[in-house]
Amino acid sequence: MPAMVEKGPEVSGKRRGRNTAASAASAAASAASAAASAAASAGTASASAAAAASAAAAPNNGQNKSLAAAAPNGNSGSNSWEEGSSGSSSDEEHGGGGMRVGPQYQAAVPDFDPAKLARRSQERDNLGMLVWSPNQSLSEAKLDEYIAIAKEKHGYNMEQALGMLFWHKHNIEKSLADLPNFTPFPDEWTVEDKVLFEQAFSFHGKTFHRIQQMLPDKSIASLVKFYYSWKKTRTKTSVMDRHARKQKREREESEDELEETNGSNPVDIEIDPNKESKKEVPPTETVPQVKKEKHSTQAKNRAKRKPPKGMFLSQEDVEAVSANATAATTVLRQLDMELVSIKRQIQNIKQTNSALKEKLDGGIEPYRLPEVIQKCNARWTTEEQLLAVQAIRKYGRDFQAISDVIGNKSVVQVKNFFVNYRRRFNIDEVLQEWEAEHGKDETNGPANQKPVKSPESSIKIPEEEDEAASVLDVRYASAS
């Protein structure tokens, strides 16, 4: 019996993982009987009972059964319990009797696609951030009250207040509690806000509470601050606009005078009682007095009876306004909308004109080609000498004109050319031809005046002068 018990661990180690239900049951029974005999001989009932219970609880472990049966006393039973527990834990780590092999246990790893990864990152970058989405659970009254509190107490505009509300998932209480924790961005004026302010200012002037009706997002303090920064940069009315306005005013006044003269009533003429004593004045002097009174009465009647300039009343509008109160408000609203649209067009046209004027103020200087300034050269080439002789034939002693024709020679150098090359190019004969053609009285320079010699005239190259003189003598002789 002891020998068989010692071989138990080896056998159980070789057959690990392949025990059947029958072998497990027989092993459990033998282990229980061995534990009972050991407990009776040693007198340690508690230790043997614990060993038997552990052996019965693990029927698949042959090592536990053999060690528990071979324990002669309590100490050996405790050692066999520790070894059996380590074996069972190793079996559990190995998956309860085998490895999980097969395609059903493998993870599906996709292929690496860098283009797809870059596309996903680009899509994430291009996605915008949602800052507001309406919710049906919120009523318009609560939403307006929340926006008003955010504007008045904390300085938020409508977009910032709605963004805070959307961040807290449309919870007004949390949003109101979180509003003091942040400082809103400074008030910024967009192009549309500036255009609306200019239109409202043209309508209402400095009545800022009426301007605020067209810009409800702006406070009166913000409107006043923007007004003082805007009025310094706005362009004044052009002369053309003032002239057109003046002509229109004169035309309207002439039309009003014609209407008053054609359909005037003598009763409308007001006569000052203090002037009744002047009835004995000759009739030649009464005409301008009556005309003056007539003009004054016409101005008073026109101011009383006619609407402001540019305004008129149509019969259809009067009938629609007199029908009921709602129709009157509708007509007035339509007229206001038309007026606003027309003034917007005017403002856009003025802005376009001002931009074009700014472009015209620069002039054409940036587009002008730069003038090429030639430096004066002391040496006379063959072409320059021939050109100088031809210029003398055309302009005579006009040294400035000859200098301009040559381009790179000053007036002093041209005078020195007269002296140095007088004999070689027969300049005297050329001057005689010019005088015969234009007359001696039209000579434009003193013939006896000696030219001022400059340091540049002292530079002479004999070989070049002889060569140029020979070439020009041949050309001039053939031409003559």
From Swiss-Prot:
Composition bias type Basic and acidic residues, residue spans: 272-282
Induction: Down-regulated by the transcriptional repressor ZEB1 during NEUROD2-induced neurogenesis.
Sequence positions bearing Phosphoserine: S121, S254, S454
Domain SANT span(s) in chain numbering: 184-235, 375-426
Annotated stretches, region: Interaction with HDAC1: 72-251
Coiled-coil features, chain-numbered ranges: 238-265, 328-363
Keywords of this entry: Chromatin regulator, Coiled coil, Isopeptide bond, Nucleus, Phosphoprotein, Repeat, Repressor, Transcription, Transcription regulation, Ubl conjugation
One term under GO cellular component: nucleoplasm
Gene3D superfamilies found in the cross-reference section: 1.20.58.1880, 4.10.1240.50, Homeodomain-like
Origin: domain of life: Eukaryota
UniProt-listed InterPro entries: ELM2_dom, Homeodomain-like_sf, REST_helical, SANT/Myb, SANT_dom, Trans_reg/Corepressor
Single GO molecular function: chromatin binding
ELM2 domain residues: 97-183
Subunit structure as annotated in this protein's UniProt entry: Component of a BHC histone deacetylase complex that contains HDAC1, HDAC2, HMG20B/BRAF35, KDM1A, RCOR1/CoREST and PHF21A/BHC80. The BHC complex may also contain ZMYM2, ZNF217, ZMYM3, GSE1 and GTF2I. Interacts with REST. Interacts with the SMARCE1/BAF57, suggesting that the BHC complex may recruit the ATP-dependent chromatin-remodeling SWI-SNF complex. Interacts directly with GFI1 and GFI1B in a RCOR/GFI/KDM1A/HDAC complex. Interacts with INMS1. Interacts with SOX2.
Domain free text: The SANT domains may bridge the nucleosomal substrates and the demethylase KDM1A.
Protein name (Swiss-Prot/TrEMBL): REST corepressor 1
Natural source organism: Mus musculus (Mouse)
